[in-house]
Regions:
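Phosphate- and other anionic-substrate recognition elements at nucleic-acid/protein interfaces
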Residues: 1-202
Length: 202
């Protein structure tokens, strides 16, 4: 991952959307900004999505991130809530793609494990680790803290795949098939040696 990369992490929602911007230079992560886009719950879902698109676009254009990361959609027993969250994620992906920003997605457990060391961490544990890692003076709002954690996850994990791709001449615009071919080639070169165990006789 190049020096001075700026990552925008987003925790989608139809009432509150958290966002966090983190910069990386070498191995050092630096807090840039964070916030929460609060939407009027009394408005229709369509109206909220329009408002979300406008405010998120302003955030993206102001901070001009190099990369972005979004929490992936997880299965929810409440089908209606899951559908609304899917609408919000669609708007988020649209805004990022329209600005030409590469998008990575991470499962909630992956984010928790990367930041707090366990996939079972609660939101406060994640927030405390975010505050410590970024040297913040206070705990950010929960949604913003989650977004910062998402950005940090990509800065810590996303660089490896990109470095492998660049080493093989595969850029950020490569297709999923090309990326898969690169990984398969690398794995083929790193197959473990076969060890033969001989039994002692007598």
């Amino acid at each position: 991952m190049p020096r001075g990369v700026i990552a925008l992490g987003i925790d989608p929602g139809t009432r509150k959307l958290g966002w966090g911007v983190v910069a990386r230079a070498g191995n050092r992560l630096t807090h840039v900004a964070h916030g929460v886009i609060a939407l009027d719950g009394s408005e229709s879902i369509a109206s909220r999505l329009v408002e979300l698109e406008g405010q998120l676009t302003q955030v993206i254009r102001h901070h001009r991130p190099n990369v972005s990361s979004v929490e992936s959609l997880f299965f929810n027993k409440d089908a209606q809530a899951a559908a609304k969250l899917g609408h919000a994620r669609g708007v988020v992906l649209l805004c990022l793609a329209r600005e030409g920003i590469p998008i990575a997605e991470y499962a909630p457990a992956k984010i928790k494990r990367t930041i707090a060391g366990t996939g079972q961490a609660d939101k406060r544990q994640v927030a405390l680790m975010v505050r410590a890692a970024l040297s913040l003076t206070s705990l950010p709002p929960v949604d913003a803290s989650d977004a910062l954690a998402i950005a940090m996850t990509h800065l810590r994990l996303g660089g490896l795949l990109q470095a492998l791709e660049e080493a093989k001449g595969v850029g950020a615009t490569a297709t999923a098939e090309n990326r898969a071919q690169v990984l398969l080639a690398l794995l083929a070169k790193k197959r473990p040696r076969r060890i033969t165990v001989r039994r002692r006789v007598g």
